[in-house]
Amino acid sequence: MFFGSCGYLGIEKHPKIIEAAVEALHSHGAQFSSSRAYVSSHYYEEAESLFSKMFGRPALVMQSLTLGHITGLPLLVGDNDAIIMDVQAHDSIQSATAMLKLRNVKIDIVRHNRMDILEERIKVLKNRYQRIWYLGDGVYSMHGDFAPVKELYALADKYEQLHLYLDDIHGMSWTGPHGTGMVMNAVPYYHRKLFLSTGMTKAFGTAGGLLTFPDEEYFKLVKTCGKGFIFSIQLPPAILAATIASCKIHMSDEIIPLQQSLMAKIDYFNKKAEELGLLVIRKEQSPV
């Protein structure tokens, strides 16, 4: 067992991924030096098409998930909206909300995974703001615990103003149908008010971030107006080609034994830790 990497499946060494990256490196070079707002590598279209099939929703590949949050959230959240953020939400989400503070957007922070407190805040804010955004993680990066997705979906059904923005990069690949993550594994459908962000830098085995949207309107808004598209360079062709190869592995049965092998290792570790009297903060079936 190796505890120093977020490459939970070891898929970054898969021959198909390496071969795809090498081929693209030879054919397109080390970089494609242009903003996506002007000229886009053809690899993006194929990668985003595959991700859209995996998640069943429009998908947008970003240079990183941090840049994805900084690009997406300021466009999605309006000046008359309010944000309720889990106290353990990833720092990259918190960095994006700092930009919204400059617009005087209302931001409340609530205790970790406390749905009772969240609902009380919704009741207080719902008559004062147009939309309410809940920001949190799918799998939290510090303790490896999960968001209560079923409860969040229930609240989104109960309160029309509530929208969910979840970062599930630590859940990507090792769980969920086609490796789509913990959120999609917890509830096997994409809520109409869910904005699910994830990425390829952990168990997926390549690099970059991913934003998914409930409909084409939000997708086009971020793709057309997002600063991360207009003022940032593209991912290298080799990374995009590797991402396409990894997508194809995820959409095949090949991903299943990799997930099962990791689950067996997690169970083994938890069992041995208990036998040895080691303190484990949370006994989740999580690699974090």
Label every model-predicted segment.
Residues 1-30, 162:
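N-terminal "arm"/small-domain region of PLP-dependent enzymes with the aminotransferase-like
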Residues 7, 108-165:
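Active-site phosphate-binding strand-loop segment of PLP-dependent enzymes
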Residues 19-64:
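Conserved N-terminal alpha-helix of the aminotransferase class I/II PLP-enzyme fold
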Residues 64, 85-101:
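Substrate-binding/gating loop at the entrance of the active-site cleft, primarily
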Residues 75-91, 265:
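Conserved PLP-anchoring active-site segment centered on the Schiff-base-forming lysine
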Residues 186-221:
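Active-site PLP attachment segment
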Residues 240-257, 271-276:
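Amphipathic alpha-helix from the class-I
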Residues 256-267, 274-288:
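Conserved PLP-binding catalytic core of the aspartate aminotransferase-like
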